Amino acid sequence: MGTTGARPSRRAVLTAAAGAAVAGIPLGGSTAFAAPRGNPDVLRQLRALEQEHSARLGVYARDTATGRTVLHRAEERFPMCSVFKTLAVAAVLRDLDRDGEFLATRLFYTEQEVKDSGFGPVTGLPENLAAGMTVERLCAAAICQSDNAAANLLLRELGGPEAVTRFCRSVGDRTTRLDRWEPELNSAEPGRLTDTTTPRAIGATYGELVLGDALAPRDRERLTGWLLANTTSTERFRKGLPADWTLGDKTGGGAYGTNNDAGVTWPPHRPPVVMVVLTTHDRPDAVADNPLVAKTAALLASALG
């Protein structure tokens, strides 16, 4: 899994993302699995991981340099959980902001709203409760710290969860749907259709947002910058990927041990890899399985790196 070369700088990654959009790198994934050279047993290893961890594992990974893909349960629905926050922020940037004016708008909220959201590490700080927060800071909190109250405030400005579904449809994603607010959207019952996506759908959408032209260049750079600054992936993608692969991602978790990570990673000196790992269980008492996500990321890096 070792990779030589210096880890790309944040500026280099943002520049490369802009270049990918201009170059029109194909992001939509092939329906066939192309076994990476030297590692024909990737699917077998993914099935073994699934059995080892008694989980349902969904995978979409696409090497934008070669078009090679790794797909496992890529068309099955999984609870989305906080992975949706990237979509909500992207919708705010595209549909509500004009030249940064809306991002500078200060929103006010109550302590009860933070408590009701279930998780507010940034919105719940006394100084933010007193003074409110700008939309720009709420976007950063929603992605970088996965702040639920920040996400709910953004959803409120958008007009509710269904606005995220409409946004997905507008960028070609006919699968991903958001129906509820935080924290109810994380209930993750097996078989539920609401608040779900598939590995292929969310992977293609993340790719369009970060590497495609779904957003204006300035908005794409902002969104990518927040994904690069994410703090919640330490035990998930970040632990499984080589240290010199730059990572911009968003995690998510909920009931039934649901544990997700989705984003884009930049190996040194080469185009990026879009990567999605979605996991869940059929037991309500199951706990989030970070090692499964990290091991899957390591396997994908080895296969496509």
UniProtKB/Swiss-Prot annotation:
E.C. numbers: 3.5.2.6
Keyword flag Signal: yes
Gene3D superfamilies noted in UniProt: DD-peptidase/beta-lactamase superfamily
Binding site for substrate: K250, T251, G252
Active site residues per record: S82 (acyl-ester intermediate)
Catalytic activity: a beta-lactam + H2O = a substituted beta-amino acid
EC supergroup of this enzyme: hydrolase
Modifications after synthesis and translation: Predicted to be exported by the Tat system. The position of the signal peptide cleavage has not been experimentally proven.
GO BP terms, alphabetized: beta-lactam antibiotic catabolic process; response to antibiotic
Keywords, ordered alphabetically: Antibiotic resistance, Hydrolase, Signal
InterPro entries tied to this protein: Beta-lactam/transpept-like, Beta-lactam_cat, Beta-lactam_class-A, Beta-lactam_class-A_AS, TAT_signal
PROSITE patterns: BETA_LACTAMASE_A, TAT
GO molecular function, one term: beta-lactamase activity
Superkingdom of this protein's organism: Bacteria
Signal sequence bounds: 1-34
Anything else known: The class A beta-lactamase family has a specific amino-acid numbering system, sometimes called Ambler or ABL numbering and often misspelt as Amber. A multiple sequence alignment was used to derive a consensus sequence and then the consensus was numbered taking into account insertions and deletions. This allows use of identical numbers, e.g. for active site residues, despite differences in protein length. UniProt always uses natural numbering of residues, hence there appear to be differences in numbering between this entry and some papers.
Family that this chain belongs to: Belongs to the class-A beta-lactamase family.
Alphabetical list of NCBIfam families matching this protein: bla_class_A (NF033103)
Name this protein carries in UniProt: Beta-lactamase
Species of provenance: Streptomyces lavendulae
